[in-house]
A protein has these predicted regions:
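Beta-propeller fold detector
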Residues: 13-34, 77-87, 138-151
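Short glycine/acidic-enriched loop and turn motifs that connect beta-strands
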Residues: 60-64, 113-123, 181
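Beta-strand-rich domains and repeat architectures in extracellular enzymes and scaffolds
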Residues: 30-63
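C-terminal edge beta-strand
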Residues: 2-9
Length: 181
């Protein structure tokens, strides 16, 4: 996919050294339960609708994510999507902070993590993007993109990146916007 981190430049970022996607199949735990049973004790961070499915991202008190595909008519859980590949390094971050849909229906999400100015600090934790695809009744999740750079951090020396995301376009050709503060 084409990802442009610097608006208006039209140049593709250097992705050498980025993490290759690791595919993990889901394990079903909340399937056929009501939404209320599945999110009891959790805080909803985002709920979106697309592809005839409602997607709910909720986190528990330890910020561990639960990502559900829900039937919008019956309000029952169709699937719990895998999140065990989602990672975060900073204690104030989230393994999975937000989700969005591409115009061609691919579910994507991001971590919220501290990204530092590499030239100043010498190294940085990456900001991660994830994707989920559906093959029949099986959901497959993977790390899609991982990046640690000054541009990713909004040119701050030390920034929390990924509280929210917005995506415009298809999965293979789109624009990602995120927060850095």
């Amino acid at each position: 996919p084409e990802i442009f981190l610097t608006p208006g430049t039209g140049t593709e970022p250097d992705v050498s050294g980025d993490i290759v996607a690791e595919y993990i199949e889901m394990k079903q735990t909340y399937v056929n339960q009501s939404i209320g049973d599945a999110i009891t004790g959790k805080t909803i961070r985002r709920a979106i609708y697309g592809n005839g499915v409602m997607y709910i991202l909720a986190v528990d008190a330890s910020k561990n994510p639960t990502l559900l595909a829900v039937d919008p008519t019956t309000h029952t859980v169709i699937a719990e999507l895998p999140t065990n590949f989602c990672v975060v390094n900073s204690p104030e971050g989230y393994k999975l902070s937000d989700i969005a849909l591409t115009s061609d229906g691919v579910l994507i999400g991001c971590s919220m993590d501290t990204v530092r100015n590499v030239s100043y600090y010498g190294s940085s934790d990456p900001w991660n993007l994830y994707k989920w695809t559906r093959d029949g009744n099986t959901w497959i999740g993977s790390k899609w993109f991982s990046r640690a750079s000054n541009e990713t951090a909004g040119n701050y020396y030390d920034a929390m990146v990924g509280s929210t995301i917005a995506y415009s376009g298809s999965f293979n050709s789109g624009t990602i916007l995120t927060t850095a503060y």
